[in-house]
Amino acid sequence: MNSTATSPLRAGVIGAGVFGGYHAGKYVENPDTTLTAIFDPDQARAQALADKHGVTAYSEVGLFLEAVDVVTIASPGVTHAEMGARALRAGKPVLIEKPLAVTGEEADQLVRLAAEHQVALACGHQERLVFDVMGLTGIQTPPRRITAWREGPWSGRSTDISVTFDLMVHDLDLALTLIGQADAETLSVEGKTERSDSLDEGSMSARFSNGAELELKASRIADDRRRGMVVEYEAGVIEIDFVARTFKNTTGFDLNPDYMDTPEGRDPLGANVARFVEAVLGRATGPAAPGEAGAAAVRFAERIDAAAGQ
C-alpha cells in the first residue's frame, strides 16, 4: 500500500446520488481531505452536487481521476467493478460503497488490481466499526448461532441489484467477521420478487464447518423498518435492536452497551471514510473493511442469489 501521500488529500466522488452526497459531505468534514471533484454520467446531477460544495463536476472519468488523490465510488452497484478498476489502474486508492462488486470474479479482480498497483481498496461495510466499539469483534470464540434481520419499506433505490447485495450483504460481512475462517457447508434460501427484476426479499440459513449456524433475512418491501441481531455463544446471548437501540448481554463478555455514544456509533460512515484516509496516509494498517472482506461478502451473496434461482 502506498503511504507516501500527504494531507490534505484531494478527494473525489463517483456517483452523485444519495450515497454520493453522503460521501462528499464526509470528505468536506474530514480535516485530512479536500473535496475536489464529482463525476456522474448524469451531468446535471453531478453539477448539482458539485455546486453544493463549490467543486468541479466532470463529464469524463479520466479527467476526474487526474484531479484527485483518493476516490469514493458510490455509483450504482453494477458499475462498481468498472469504475473501481479504472481508478485502481490509475493508481488511486479507492473506497467502494457496498457491494464491492456484483460477482465474485469482479470483486477478486479489484483485489488483485489494488495489490498490483499497491493502493488501498476499502469497502463500505462501515458497521464493522460499530461492532469494534461494541467489543463484539474482540471475542475470540466463534458464536454458535447468529440470527439477523434487516428490513425496510420500498425506496426505489438500488434496483440494479438484489436485496442480497443491497441490504443482506452488510449482515453477511458482519457474520463472516464473527464466525471467522470457516466454510458454509450447507445453504438454503427463500426469496421473492415484487418491485424489481431481482430478489426484493430473501432469507437464508447456513451451517459452517466450525459448527456455527447463520440465519439472515433482508427485505426492501417491508411495511416497517426493522433491524437487529442475536448472537448466541455457549456463555450466553447478545441481543441488539438497532432501531429501538436496545442491547442485552448475558454472556459475561466485556461489551459496550453505550456504543451509540461513540463517534463510530454516531457516524459510522464518517468513521469509515476517516479510517480509509488514515490508511492512505500511512497512519492505519489498513481500511476498516479491506477489499478482501468486501470480496468475501460478494462471493457469499452471489452464492445466495444462485441458490434462489437468480
Which residues fall in each region the model found?
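A contiguous active-site-proximal alpha/beta segment in oxidoreductase catalytic domains
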Residues: 101-158
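C-terminal helix-rich "cap/oligomerization" subdomain common to oxidoreductases
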Residues: 1-4, 63, 70-73, 209, ...
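NAD(P)-dinucleotide binding in Rossmann-like oxidoreductases
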Residues: 194-195, 210-272
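Beta-loop-alpha module in the N-terminal Rossmann-like domain of NAD(P)-dependent dehydrogenases
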Residues: 23, 42, 53-111
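Rossmann-like dinucleotide-binding domain that binds NAD(P)(H)
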Residues: 155-224, 292
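N-terminal Rossmann-like dinucleotide-binding module
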Residues: 1-53
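Hydrophobic residues in well-ordered beta-strands that form the structural core
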Residues: 59, 96, 121-123, 240
